[in-house]
Amino acid sequence: MPEEIISRSINDEMITSYMLYSMSVIVGRAIPDVRDGLKPVQRKILFGMLELGLRHNQSYKKSARIVGEVMGKFHPHGDMAIYDALVRMAQPFSMRYPLIQGQGNFGSIDRDPPAAMRYTEARMQRLAEELLADIDKNTVKMIPNFDGSLIEPEVLPAKAPNLLMNGASGIAVGMMTNIPPHNLSELVEALTALIDNPDATIEELMEYVKGPDFPTGGIIMGRDGIKKMYETGRGRMVVRGVAEIEEAKGGTRIVISEIPYGVSKADLIQQIANVAQNVRDIQVRNVRDESDKRGLRVVIELKRGADPNVVLNLLYKHTQLQTTFGAHMLVIDEKKRPKLMNLKEIFQAFIKHRYEVVKRRTEYELEQASKKAHILEGLTKASRAIDTVVDIIRNSKNIQEASVNLQETLEITPEQSQAILEMRLGKLTALEIDKLVTEYAELVEKIKEYREILSDDKNIYQIIKKELQELEAQYGDARRTKISIDGNTDFNVEDVIPDDEVVVTVTKKGYIKATPLEDYRKQGRGGKGIRGVKTTDADFVTNVVSTTRLSKTVVITSKGKAYFINNYELECTSRSSRGKLLANYVKIEPDETVQAVLSVKREEVANKHLIITTRKGKIKRTPFEAFINSRTSGIKAITLNEGDSVVDAGISTSEEETIIISTRKGMVIRFPISQIRPMGRTAAGVKAMALRGDDEVVSATIVLPVDERYLFTATERGVGKRTPLSEYRPQHRAGMGVKNIYGLERTGYVVGSLVVTNEDEIIVITKNGMSIRIPAADIRPTGRVTKGVKVVELRDDDTVASLAVVVDQAEV
């Protein structure tokens, strides 16, 4: 044979070949058929077991024998792929209604691998036989196998709605399917209702089908995801394990009796052990597996004093004790096309398939009954003229002549004459003749019944209903998975997060984190500090606030926008950790810089105002209620003039308060908050201070009119001073202020000012990430017109970047 070479573009060949491969994987491997709910390999395994006679009441055969049968006759692929599919159909934790009975080690819920196929044995479950029932009655199309030597079913008759009953999952090329299993009794009720009322809505069908029913039980949180899945074919459901809190002699413990579908028990136990070490609020003393043949049981022993509800909710959050099931009901329809179907479409496809099966079965049975009745009719005629029949046969030269003579004499067909010639003499007894007559009469009634069925589609649908109800009676069981109506998977943060004191820091490049306050150790004045945050030369801490985990951090940016972040959402980590970018929490713009970090509790905003000060000396006062509905994209807090930017912000709780504003060149002004009228959220503000030359505002602090506290001022080179607030008399807003510190040429410009008491502690953080915690009492009070003293010993390449007062939790 001459060689033929076809010249073709490699691009075209790759496209064509890959498309063929893709469709082969989609249609022939990974996606189930909507009619019988089986992937090709599963269908071939069940058909192969039927061919081997492995019914539920027959003896087991080695799995290797089954795999060999399927691989050699129907599925010429890897033996392990076939064995894995066989194993899964036998696992009660994988299939809601297993189709295969396994004998031996077929794996476990701990994801232990099954024994080799040469050791295990299998046979069909009785329910699997229902999927194959009537396959010998021309109910489904039979197609050639891979080499054309045998035939196999294109789809099984599937008396049971296997697609939704057992679900399916698979990944093809460019598409995937993930269909959850359901309760058979609920499916039968819904299918029956749809047969009775083809116009039933999905919402009406959901009165019968409550939701997925996983083999491992669990709780589905809410019905929204279920409804969306049934309406669109896609949906996400939160599934929780079932856990109970028990009081024992040794203390409190949590006992898990059910886990989410698809979760490995061993992996879950390992996850619990890991989070117990890494999440400080999960106070777990010990985890052990007490599962046995009676069921699953994981016992979590809690530390003394631990709140079990707190621990349980944190386990839901941090482990696979709570998972999300993403449903994607993609199937292969009757035309061999992948299609995303909703609940009603799947039901309609199944009913249509069953209609065809029942119709073809009835037609087959009618044909067989008609053929048999035809024969019996001839035998009956012969029985009425036995002597004549015997004479004809005896006087005929051969069988052919006898057949012709019988046809002519009795007026029968060739088939009937052939049956008469093949009839045994024993059939000529009176008893046997009576049986023939009776059988013929019964067949006539059956033929009438079959024709009646085929005469009206309603009769076929009634048969479908009857067979479904018989299935429910035999295989239906109680629902295993509970459904929580409210669907609230959120838990009260106050129940699970202790309101511990933390320090929130923000770096110049926008990294934010929360650190437990206890991680900052006390040092004396002049100490070199400890590393507070890992930074680089190009990044350093710019803002720090002492707050609590249940407060909100308010980030005010240079562009006048306010961002609100729940502190419990912040990464709570060590001093040396860099934290996470603000962009992980809020949608801060690239050209914005953080100018102030505040703390507030949502329930305490009623009488509070946000005071914003700009670099060019503007100030505004806005009620905090205006910011309640803040968005992750931020909310505008002030309208800025060209060239101006926000430099600081604070929280005011009373009009009796005053505000002290410090400038870069050591000037300070103090005036009453009442001189700033409340404005709208987007107002531009009023003049706060008259600035000289290129001087700029660096900070603003809010205080009471009569206040025995002190103003702590720090400079770039670590020089600070603590001056009684009484030294700064109130002035009118928009004045030039008074001198606060001298010797700036030696100490560097002012970084900021804070109001402190003798009991307060101050955290000073430098550009290079060093931090020092200083008791305010260690800094000797001085007058207003002084140079200050050294409070932080800095390295040559370092400067002070920011400072904050460590406050008691009650003050936050």
From Swiss-Prot:
GO molecular function per UniProt: ATP binding; DNA binding; DNA negative supercoiling activity
Miscellaneous section: Few gyrases are as efficient as E.coli at forming negative supercoils. Not all organisms have 2 type II topoisomerases; in organisms with a single type II topoisomerase this enzyme also has to decatenate newly replicated chromosomes.
Assembly with partners or alone: Heterotetramer, composed of two GyrA and two GyrB chains. In the heterotetramer, GyrA contains the active site tyrosine that forms a transient covalent intermediate with DNA, while GyrB binds cofactors and catalyzes ATP hydrolysis.
EC class of the enzyme, as a word: isomerase
Family: Belongs to the type II topoisomerase GyrA/ParC subunit family.
GO biological process: DNA topological change; DNA-templated DNA replication
Main subcellular location: cytoplasm
CDD domains cross-referenced by the UniProt entry: TOP4c
Active site: Y119 (o-(5'-phospho-dna)-tyrosine intermediate)
EC number: 5.6.2.2
Protein origin, superkingdom: Bacteria
Coiled coil: none
Gene Ontology CC, one term: DNA topoisomerase type II (double strand cut, ATP-hydrolyzing) complex
Motif GyrA-box: chain residues: 523-529
Gene name per UniProt: gyrA
Function: A type II topoisomerase that negatively supercoils closed circular double-stranded (ds) DNA in an ATP-dependent manner to modulate DNA topology and maintain chromosomes in an underwound state. Negative supercoiling favors strand separation, and DNA replication, transcription, recombination and repair, all of which involve strand separation. Also able to catalyze the interconversion of other topological isomers of dsDNA rings, including catenanes and knotted rings. Type II topoisomerases break and join 2 DNA strands simultaneously in an ATP-dependent manner.
Entry keyword GTP-binding: no
Ranges for domain Topo IIA-type catalytic: 31-496
Organism: Kosmotoga olearia (strain ATCC BAA-1733 / DSM 21960 / TBF 19.5.1)
Protein name: DNA gyrase subunit A
Reaction(s) catalysed (UniProt annotation): ATP-dependent breakage, passage and rejoining of double-stranded DNA
Keyword Iron: no
Record HAMAP family: GyrA (MF_01897)
Keywords: ATP-binding, Cytoplasm, DNA-binding, Isomerase, Nucleotide-binding, Topoisomerase
Compartments in which it is found: Cytoplasm
PROSITE patterns per UniProt: TOPO_IIA
